């Protein structure tokens, strides 16, 4: 099967390559560092203890291989613009339909969750602020930066990513200084790396606690693949994408591992408060009185970055589906600024609907957990399809792999190993009540997609192939 784009040859009707190397580097960084690190790391530390460092390292390593597989696939054919394109080519339009719409859903529900988070952070300064003012302001703001040129989106994500980097760098520097100087906390605890080793017992909660850490930590990596969705809008993808992907392990080690080591060195794992940000606690212990306000600003921009990335990703995914006849044709139209404006408006409306449904829940926390779990399950499916596409690519296009200058390390064997790991992650997500509910909702979603494809698209596709 030879892949053919369903796009016009007119360059005015194609996505514009407006993203520079610095944009993609920070977009990739923003995708690898989510709100979960700033706000959720306290819970992961309390659940898993020092072994949480291994949890983040294992998940990060697995997703690095996913990104390498995606990178080789995207660069093997200049016509590939996203995972929908290579999954269509390798696995057929049916799987591409599933993965495209599932990826879209994952970012829609993530966007709704991000809006909830932004409202919470805004209430830190303005407790009586009407939530709907925040909702419409956020969506309007992100629309402006996405409607006119892809470079505007890139600039916004660049600065959002820079804020994250600075915040984590400051934490690591301040924490390292506290360790070196033997800082003593008000309760008499002396900062030391010995707290991380925990007298040789890095699994204080046992294997159960270690596995529980995966359930929470997986959410922190949602969006790591977003750099791949920019392939059609990067000025020099063959140079820029490998740089962005190759830097992922360094970023994970530096920003996740180092920050967790510093946090647990200053505050022993069993003294970390689960429902508080360990970043806030660190700055407070260091005597920075405006720590809460500073970290609130950082997590606010982190949630805003995630929502903005979600709007970008959903619009490009819908655009790709529309050009492959997996979505209404009108959603595949580009504006004079070379952006899929109709797809942007459609995705924003769905994010608004998602927030509305979530806000009606009697328990916002429970609803938040469910929607983020649905997102994580959808992402596990998407990441798995990337790996399966790579396995098929290696079998059916050996000549392309032989010519590739960006080969995935480990090849097919690594793909199967990571697929087994993802299956285990899915099993872990069924062990908790809220995440099991999300699992059942996800099954309903896949059943809905199956019925939709069979009724509306399967026969149409078969006729066109005759």
Where does each model-flagged region fall?
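Membrane-interface "cap" regions at the ends of multi-pass membrane proteins
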Residues: 1-41, 46-51, 64, 68, ...
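Helix-loop-helix connectors at the membrane interface of multi-pass transporters/channels
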Residues: 3-8, 84-90, 94, 114-135, ...
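Helix-loop-helix junctions that connect adjacent transmembrane segments
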Residues: 3-6, 10-11, 15, 52-53, ...
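Extracellular loop-to-transmembrane helix junctions
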Residues: 16, 39-134, 144, 250-253, ...
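Membrane-helix boundary/coupling elements in multi-pass transport proteins
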Residues: 79-80, 102-117, 221-234, 292-329, ...
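TM-loop-TM module centered on a large, flexible mid-protein loop between adjacent transmembrane helices
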Residues: 85-88, 92, 124, 197-200, ...
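Membrane-interface loop-to-helix entry segments
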Residues: 119, 133-191, 222, 245-249, ...
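C-terminal membrane-solvent junction of multi-pass transporters and transport-like membrane proteins
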Residues: 160, 330-341, 380-434
